[in-house]
Amino acid sequence: VTIKETGEPDTVYTYGEYMRRFVREVKAKGARPILFSLTPRNAWDDKDSTRITRVNKTFGLWARQVAEAENVPFVDLNEITASKFERFGKEKVKTMFYIDRIHTSAFGARVNAESAAEGLRGVKGLELAQYLLPVEIDTKTGSSRKPGRPVVFTIGDSTVKNEDKDDDSMWGWGSVLHELFDTTKVSVENHAMAGRSARTFLDEGRWDKVYNALQPGDYVIMQFGHNDGGDINTG
């Protein structure tokens, strides 16, 4: 082709050929390449769809084919995260992106990074997976649930949950809320955290734990504001 801006001729290769070059040059250095499919966009098959649009017939497919041809590991990041997005639903997925449908927010970046780690763990015999930190399994959130009973979750700041120990220490109201409910009919769990704003509660993954424990019929009582007027990433 001729480059419009310079008038100089240049050779342009396919996506697959560029990927093969990366793989071969990595191997030539004695390093180990791993191919990923690209992250999913905030794009649904249509306006009423509950399915994220995949790239398994274009760039995702071509990356997989290169990996197979070059005998290197492949992680389908697109599929792993897209499946999560579909469980989250459209409204929550909006918080995963920043400005446009491609570039993620901090929340979305963490979801993609977690998906990448999941994919690496799933590659049989991949030494790199041994260097990943152990997966932390949340066994606390929702643990008070009894069959047929809803759970009341509280989230918020130090006025909802504090030291909550001695009569002469600071207490949050969420720590005593259970005293006002008939706990033979409902469970009450306080997942607030002192010093948190609505943003940092989300940013630290605390909301995800509650969100993942929610079932139809549950309640979430939320109170933030004391720490939301400060610096964006503190409080």
Residue ranges, per PLM feature:
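Acidic helix-start/capping segments at beta-turn-to-alpha-helix junctions
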Residues: 43, 193-198
